[in-house]
Amino acid sequence: MKNKKTRRFKIRYIVFGLLCVMALAALVFMRFGGFGTGENVNPEEFLAYAEPVENITVPESAKIIALGEATHGNAEFQQLKLEVFKLMVKNNGVRAFALEGDYGGCEQVNRYIHGGEGTAQEAAAAIGFSIYRTEEMAELISYMRQYNESALEGEDLRFYGFDMQRLSYSMRFLKESCKELEVDTTNLQKLVEGENWSSECDLSTRTETLTQVKKELESKNGSENAIHFVDILMQHSELQTLTNADGATLRDQFMAENVQWILQQEQRNGHENIFVTGHNSHVAKWGSSDSMGKLLSKDAANGYYVIGTDFYKTHCNMPTRSPEKRTIQVFYSHDPLAKAAKLAGFDICWLDFTKVPENSELGRQASEYTYMGTLGESYSIIMRLLPPSYRMFQPPAVLYDSMIFVTDANPTKILEE
């Protein structure tokens, strides 16, 4: 009898021990996205080719210079927007900054940096996405305003948006332009209720009204910017009728068209190139779907050059399912290049793939399919169980011309409106 009880206790201890081991393994897996932080290339070889960010150079032929961000919720990736843009202004004659942000909201920023009222923080909030309500974006906007205070005529910096996911500012500025150009806005007024489309007007009604306004504007001199507001509103209107999957593809197509429009505006003003920045998934020049970058890179006349980014480890500021609440979550990219940057002692560095020999270990790894981090504006506990949901599996040197690696990325702090 005693032996039976002893055996039962032993079995219970064994089962309990196995459950503890399984629970610990699950916690490790959920923390690191695997049973460790991934593989890495030779840190010494990486060290031989990696350079500081201030060494970034792009070909003279580059007309659209793009900077990606692996996440929307890290301070370093927002700081890089300013740091790299300054280099492009100084070394490449760039005068246009184009953001993955609402076109109308970014026009409000553009007016601010040209002497408009308000504060840099208020200007950043006008962009329309909470991810840009940060001190990092306010610092970028302040730099552009300060630069313009002493800029020569025609050499001022300009702030553009190439997204179309907001309505209010584009509609407001379109109405202002119509009033200045003596174009009737009676029917335009009927299209909106507050900051949204009127429920009484369907897609065909909106399209018909906006098309008529555009036709009238085309007969007026100096109406090009106003016409683009119409185009943005038509894009926004069409996107509202599509599912997420179809809408994402169309959004990238629209963003590519808008970037080309921005480039054309700058070239008419005597500037041959522009700087654009958005999520890696939009600026990458290759992928399974037609991203903005892929579409732009197909046309050699664009001279598309893209700098991707990645992290080794991130504390990322992300929204929960409740729009008002955000959370800071830790992720590891499992990118062997980012891990090599960490082991080589870098906090941040730049790697130009054109300088890395193709037959080297580093060159082969950069050209092979590998994991990289990619986090957007959403978080779910499922991401802990499915690491591919926050990683992409692509060849870095095919997606980008060069990359910046941030080894330990810190969260942004979203400012109150």
Task: Go through each PLM region and give its residues.
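Structured catalytic-domain cores with a bias toward divalent-metal coordination
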Residues: 2-417
